[in-house]
Amino acid sequence: MSEQGEVTLRAYGLVLAATVSYTSLTFIWFTLPAYLSVVIEEVGLTGTEAGILAGAVPLTYIPLALFTGVAVDRIGLDYSLAAGLLIFGLAQIGRSFATGFPSLLACTLLIGVGATVITFGLPKLVSILFPPAETGFPSSIYLVGAAAGTASAFAIGRPVIGPFLGGWRPLFLWSGVFAVGYAVVWFTTARVFSLEGTTPEHERSEDATLASNSISRDIRAILAHRELRLVVVVGTVYLLVIHGMQGWLPTILESRGMDPGPAGQATSLLIGANVVGILVVPTVADRLEARRAAVMTCGCVIFVGLAGVLAGGIGLLMAAGVVATGFGVGGLSPLIRAIPPELEGIGARLTGTAVGFVFAVGEIGGFLGPVLIGTLHDLTGSFAPGLLVLAGGAVVAVGAGYAMQDVSG
């Protein structure tokens, strides 16, 4: 094998190893929504408290995301990803022993702290291992891994693994133990594969000047960038919809008379369609050089899908709506990560900081999605008002896409 082939193989090996950390994170994250109806009954939660728990991980991104993005850019991915795994793994173990809303909330917020590191570390890893024109496929790998973790929480975590282990508490315990163990595996793998040895020349030259660039200058450049601010709007809608739907869809369907098993599997359908969107939309957008049009199209698809969920009961129309919604948000997911490195003044060097900014603001939507659905249900006795809020967000995404200048890889 040629030297270039060995470098490429090593780069993909690191991406695959890091992807396991994302899969573990999303499985742990969404074990609570998968078991939400059970936890509500057992712990005695109100709809508002359940919504806060479902939105607690996104809530941590608001104060921490920008700081974490800057830290990942400077600390190194071997230490930072291992620390993230350790934090959310220990928090999941703590969540298995929680006895009420305060302890559940504290542990879930701590999961969010570790989650920020993984969310911004993976785009950074891809940006240093691959040149900008070749980041699409490796980015899809870790996003599919993240979706697999989420889908597994609903498809096998609730109906299979949880009952086998004895309920939600043992499931939380052992998934946390796995994450803590994998922190050691990742750190060892990163050292053996040598992240520095896989860093391409276009990134090394920028790394050499990194120390001379102050954090404050980097942040000012991020905040002043018009196109990045529009990406933030799209990111906010993406997070509003995906966290709102993933956090509440099983409970919404159970309230319509669907059994817990099929309700969880319907949520897996959302994630499966999300994966298809992740794989298809950025590829088509880059081939047609039409990322702006892709953003607008995804917003329209999300709106139509949510209308189907609203009107479809538990029948085929609902299922089609779930698929459309999942496909639309799946398409937005890689776009909000792929656009920042291509923006003038951002590039690979500031990718972690830029994506951190997108999520720092965008996770306001990620927090409000689940909270509004739960609160509006408490106030009205219906999930329809919350779903209408998500549909309104899809319209906003269309407008933000229209205002963008197209950026294509």
Where are the model-predicted features located?
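Conserved MFS/SLC helix-loop-helix module at the cytosolic interface between two early adjacent transmembrane helices
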Residues: 63-100
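Flexible cytoplasmic inter-helical loops of multi-pass small-molecule transporters
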Residues: 188-217
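Helix-breaking motifs and short loop linkers at transmembrane-helix boundaries and internal kinks
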Residues: 44, 76, 97-102, 131, ...
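Helix-loop-helix hairpin linking two adjacent transmembrane segments in secondary transporters
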Residues: 133, 141-196
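Cytoplasmic helix-loop-helix junction between adjacent transmembrane helices
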Residues: 107-148
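A late C-terminal transmembrane helix in Major Facilitator Superfamily
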Residues: 345-382, 390
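Extracytoplasmic gate region of multi-pass secondary transporters
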Residues: 33, 225-268, 273-282
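Cytoplasmic membrane-interface "Motif A"-like loop-to-helix N-cap segments
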Residues: 74-84, 286-300
